[in-house]
Amino acid sequence: MFIRIFAPKLIILMKPLILISNDDGYQAKGINCLIKMVREYGDIIVCAPDSARSGYACAFSATTPLRLTLQHKEEGLEVWSSNGTPVDCIKLALSELCPRKPDLVIGGINHGDNASVNTHYSGTMGVTMEGCMKYINSVAFSLCDYRADADFSPLEPYIRQIVQRVLNEGLPKGVCLNVNFPLIEEKEYRGVRLCRMAYGTWGSEVAKCHHPRGYDYYWMMGHYTNDEPEREDTDNWALNHGYVAITPTRMDVTAYEAFEALKQYEL
């Protein structure tokens, strides 16, 4: 796959430039499987956290000096790590590593789903939203499996197809894709569905513990409840019924449908 760049009396064919990051760290199995899956589609620059940064969403480092460390380099592939957040990694890569504007930003493959309200907490989606805010075609991939040795091989044909399509056709301005995969055997996949985010809530989120030295401390945990389990148009329903869930996600979070109901707020 090549991109044509036109100049006076000159046509230059260039491979697409793909920027990849995650929130599980550059050594995670998911991101390394992703690199292999999309390697043939362009030149790859990876800039990912030096360790796990799950739950960082769109956070960036305003008061911490950031570092970049080259971990691996070969023809068409560079892998960098940073002490920053997932969004820091994208900002750093766009400023310091990419020779031109990438044709695609990919977040993932995440160890664990990023469906429903998890979208708002996800560092993987932070990567994708940052790309989207820079008007770069951006996609996030996540598997409903938190294990470090998760099997990502069933995802390959779907990821390859989605990446090819986005590179060829692009996405609407201000829209990125949040793609979640169910934890099932490859033969059990039933297809792909376009979905909306399910409404869900987290409860029992804090576990209080007592330290032997006399003070209390807390672990963030929690239990997720799908508030609309029967709605077949949601990502949770699709995942629970063996479908790959694709949720088009907007950079613009304005609730346009609420304008009429809230007109009385105008002065």
What would you call each of these model-derived segments?
Residues 127-131:
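Hydrophobic/aromatic ligand-binding patch that stacks against planar heteroaromatic rings
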Residues 153-267:
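Electrostatically charged, flexible surface regions
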Residues 20-27, 118:
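Short, glycine-rich nucleotide/cofactor-binding loops
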Residues 2-13:
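Short, Lys/Arg-enriched N-terminal segments with co-localized hydrophobic residues
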Residues 132-154:
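Glycine-rich phosphate/pyrophosphate-binding loops
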Residues 24-33, 221:
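Short acidic, Gly/Ser-rich segments with clustered Asp/Glu that frequently serve as metal-coordination loops
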Residues 113-122:
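Glycine/threonine-rich flexible loop motifs
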Residues 15-18, 29-96, 100-101:
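A cross-family phosphate/adenosyl-ligand binding-site feature
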